[in-house]
Amino acid sequence: MKLLVACVVSMILAGCAMLPSSFDAQEHARIVTINQLSADNRVCATRELAQTTSQEITREADWVHRYGASLGNNEKMTRMHANLLAMSRELSERYGRGEVSVVYCRAKLDNIHKATQTMIGVSARRPRL
């Protein structure tokens, strides 16, 4: 009897895995990573750390933008991805020119953090089917 129950449960679980999901874990995870990086107040303390972090945020934002653009029914998120990528590129390029103050760094990271907070909320609850 236990074997029969185990077989039925495993078949049900395997069947559930075949149903499409509206939640995209890959996109969501990358947005959360950007959110975490932008929330760290210590990032702007040194130029080297801020530059490295801004480059990492830009790489993640570029991935999210390219990935999101390749999906169907994702136009609104793709616009948010484009804005996030523009903000992150601006910060990264400023560090490339050496023109960044701590105040600017914190303000830009705060804007990125707020944008990703909105994106997290949207990506967690939207259907994409």
Task: State where each predicted segment sits.
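Membrane-proximal N-terminal soluble sensing/regulatory segments of transmembrane proteins
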Residues: 44-55, 59
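Long, low-complexity or tandemly repetitive, helically biased scaffold regions used
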Residues: 36-39, 89, 93, 129
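Sec-dependent signal peptide recognition
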Residues: 1-10
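Amphipathic alpha-helix face/heptad-repeat signature
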Residues: 23, 27-30, 53, 80, ...
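Long, amphipathic, charge-rich alpha-helical segments that form helical bundles/coiled-coils
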Residues: 60-108
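C-terminal partner/receptor-binding element of secreted or periplasmic proteins
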Residues: 103-129
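Post-signal peptide N-terminal segment of mature Sec-exported envelope proteins
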Residues: 22-46
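N-terminal Sec signal peptide cleavage junction
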Residues: 15-16
